[in-house]
Amino acid sequence: MEASNQDEIIGTDVIPNEQDNPEEVVPEPTSLDVPPPPPERAPSAPKRVEILDCNSLNGLMYHYFAQGDYIECKSIIGEIQSKYLERNEAAFHVRGLIARNEGELEEAMECFHKAYELSGKNKRYFYETGRCNFLLGRHQIAVEQLTKASEVMKDNPKVWYWLARAIYHFPAEKVQGKTFNPVESARTILMKPDIAKDATLICFLGRLCEELGDTSGAIAAYKSSLKLQPDNTEVMNLLGLIYLRTGQVQEGFVQLGNCLAYDPANSQAILTIGSIMQNHSDHDVALNKYRVAADVSDYNGCLWNNIGIGLLARNKPAASHSALKKAAFINPLNYKISYNLGVLHDIMNLHCSALHYIKLCTELYPQNAKAVGAMAVILSHMNDDKNARLAYKKSIELKKNPSTILNYAIFEYRMKDVTAASNALKLYKDLQASGVKCSANNKETANLLESVLKQPDQSAEQ
């Protein structure tokens, strides 16, 4: 009998020992068990943080804006805003400036408002929005915003300049029993000594003084402006004109001559000098001056008006008519051009056309006594004596012009109303005695009429 193997297990069913599958054994935790440490991970590379500078393209944007290349500038602005999610303050600011220069004022205000929000509500942007509101005609809102801007921009003369311009457009009204004068208020703002550093501001101050009748203040302002900008031909013109208005002809010619020295083709200076020459009956020299101005500034109604007067003085009515018609086409609302056309048509015996232009002149400027007097002359040429007499009386009522009064005296003499003619002639003599300037031709005509009016009295005495 063979010995049995003790390692052999006899039987069909095998009962596994718990130690055969150790993974399935869950030991009961004890207080002495310590959790195993976590597995060590390989160190990862540090993350790279990219710092975005939203102002990196500002230099290129300002470069295109300064050059006036708005297309490229707007392209750069679009790139900046799309890349930095519209968080660039300078881009909105420059875009607003471009929109304002292009006349898109509402878009400009929207851009300035966004820049204002991004800047932490910087009050300096009230200056930009105030200018937009001024251009839109919202003067009250413009004054409020520019006043806020002046609190942080006290040394910027442009803020005060635009504030004065906005106040200048206010209506004159009574406030608490006092009359509010916008021109006086605007001048008061610009009279501050610490802001008188800008030529444009001082030039506007001179215009305000001139409007208020302060001639000496206007001259002083224009001189100060010339010290800041010695080559400013516009200020030279204004100073020359105010010298001429005050009777300082020599000083006026000096300023106009300086203007032509800087700009020989300056149409405004040439027009002023030419008109003075025409007043002294030097029409040929004036026309030569106008020829230079016409080459540079052909589309100038006042220039062609003066050319027409010069040609009429040289007895060229057809050429004068062409020049005056061109002047009327360029500037149809200038009453002086309509007046000259009326006088020209009356000289050419075209009385209906003359009456049409003189009537247009009186509609443009109803209180023009000279035009009403010219209408009376034309009506008398048309044998409308009743309306001519009414026009003469209306003209004398508006202003006692020596030429109109003398024409009325001659008209009444022709109508055989000696009494009315004598009264009109007496009124003319009184004006002449009071120092009113009368031409030598008018004086000679008045003396002749006086001698004629005395003849019926002498024959009645005999």
Swiss-Prot record:
One of its GO terms (biological process) is protein localization to cilium. Disruption phenotype: Single mutants do not display any obvious defects in ciliogenesis. Double bbs-4 and bbs-5 mutants display a defect in cilia structure and function. This is characterized by an increased accumulation and mislocalization of intraflagellar transport proteins and impaired movement of intraflagellar transport proteins along the ciliary axoneme. Double mutants also have defective polycystin-mediated cilia signaling and mislocalized and increased accumulation of mechanosensory receptors pkd-2, osm-9 and odr-10 within cilia. It holds the Pfam family TPR_11. GO terms for cellular component: BBSome; ciliary basal body; ciliary membrane; cilium; cytoplasm; pericentriolar material. Coiled coil: none annotated. TPR repeats lie at residues 89-122, 124-156, 199-232, 234-266, 268-300, 335-368, 369-402. The keyword Metal-binding does not apply. It is found in: Cytoplasm, Cytoskeleton, Microtubule organizing center, Centrosome; Cytoplasm, Cytoskeleton; Cell projection, Cilium membrane. One of its GO terms (molecular function) is protein-macromolecule adaptor activity. Gene3D superfamilies: Tetratricopeptide repeat domain (1.25.40.10). Component of the BBSome complex. The BBSome complex is thought to function as a coat complex required for sorting of specific membrane proteins to the primary cilia. The BBSome complex is required for ciliogenesis but is dispensable for centriolar satellite function. Required for proper BBSome complex assembly and its ciliary localization. May be required for microtubule anchoring at the centrosome but not for microtubule nucleation. May be required for the dynein-mediated transport of pericentriolar proteins to the centrosome. Belongs to the BBS4 family. Part of BBSome complex, that contains at least bbs-1, bbs-2, bbs-4, bbs-5, osm-12, bbs-8/ttc-8 and bbs-9. Interacts (via C-terminus) with bbs-5; the interaction is direct. This is BBSome complex member bbs-4. It comes from Caenorhabditis elegans. The lineage of its organism: Eukaryota, Metazoa, Ecdysozoa, Nematoda, Chromadorea.
